Structure formats: structure tokens, C-alpha cells
Amino acid sequence: MTDAAKPGTTDDTDICLMLSLPERIQQMNIGVLRSMLQKGCIPLVVTVNQPYRILMKRYAKEGLDPQKIFIIDAVTQYSGGMCDDGQNVRYVTNPANLTDLGIAITEMLKQNPDQRKCIVFDSVSMLLIHIPSVTASKFLHFVMNKLRLTNVDGIFLCVEKGLDPVILTQLSSFVDRIVEFDSPEQGAGLATITS
């Protein structure tokens, strides 16, 4: 595991870019959520990767309580799927609709105001398929600063070799640290993010 912390970080939030091999990104998602829930943190998953219904089934299969996980789904409507009603889900028409995505994030952050929350963005790599890299970089910078201003931790998942070096450099300057994900147990090592 490589974990490079940025010196001089003094605030209470932790913004982390987690890199994984493509075949391990789902394990990374599960490991991160498991760690958050064990620490009493409310996970808010922003998915531009898989639909809400699929994620909920996977989380339940992995022993995670779907009722404790909030989802912003930018995939279901885009793919022509049916949107399930639910208190823990907000739908955005497509991953390129950054205005609605930003509004949904803001609204979900306002829910449960007295509880510690953490955003998991799944995934930066998939977002880059839908929008130009410059636009993605600006949007992610906006989201990361919103998290800092609201004292919410953020974990941004990404396929390790899926980023242009320029984008990786930009994101590296936005985050507090970069973690290379090696195993499902590593999600438990994220105590500094969710404690």
C-alpha cells in the first residue's frame, strides 16, 4: 500500500484519491464502505459507474446494510432503467449533467446534519468517459472544496492506469493523499478518513 499524505493539512477533513487495478475497483468500493460503516460514518456514494439497484444488491450480498448507505445515481436514467423510489437515493439524468450532480450532492449533504458523513465518488475514471478532462477536473475541484467547506471527508475512486498524467497531477494537488488499493482488507486501513 502506498499512502502519500500531504504535509501541512490541518483541517478535520480528509480528501483521498484511491487508485486500483480495474478488476479490483468493486472490492475497493466495498472495502471503503465497510470501513466507513464500522466507524459510524454515513456513506454517500456518487455513482457514475453502476446503477443504484445493482449497487444495493451487491452491498447486501457483501453484508453491508443498504439502509445505511445513501446513493446519488447518474447511471440508471442514462441507461434507460427504472428509478426506484427511496429516501436513500437521488437520480441524476446522466453523468455529464454536472449541474444536477452538484445540486444532488449538496442536497444529500444536508440530510442528517448532525451525523458524520463521507462521500465516495465511484469513479473518476468513468466520469472522464462522459465529459472532457478539463471539465471533470474543474467539477472535481468544486466538489472537493465543497466537502472541505462542509467538513465532509471524500474518497474518489479511480482505475490506476485510467487517468491521463496531467489529470492525475491536477487531482494530486486537490487531495490530501493518494492511496493505492492492494486488497479488500485495505479499506479497513482508512481509519483516518472515517474516524
Could you describe each region identified by the protein language model?
Residues K39, D65, S173-V175:
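Short, structured coil segments at secondary-structure junctions
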Residues P51-M56, S79-G80, L163-V166:
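Short, charged/polar "capping" segments at the starts of alpha-helices
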Residues V152-D153, C158-S195:
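Phosphate-binding/switch region of NTP-binding enzymes
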Residues A4-P7, T13, K61-P95:
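Nucleotide-state-sensitive switch-loop elements of NTP-binding domains
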Residues A136-G162:
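Substrate-engagement module of ASCE P-loop NTPases
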Residues L17, L44, C118-F121, I155:
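Structural motif
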Residues M1-R58:
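Glycine-rich P-loop/Walker A and Walker A-like loops and their local beta1-loop-alpha1 context
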Residues G81-F142:
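Phosphate-binding/switch loop-helix module in NTP-utilizing enzymes
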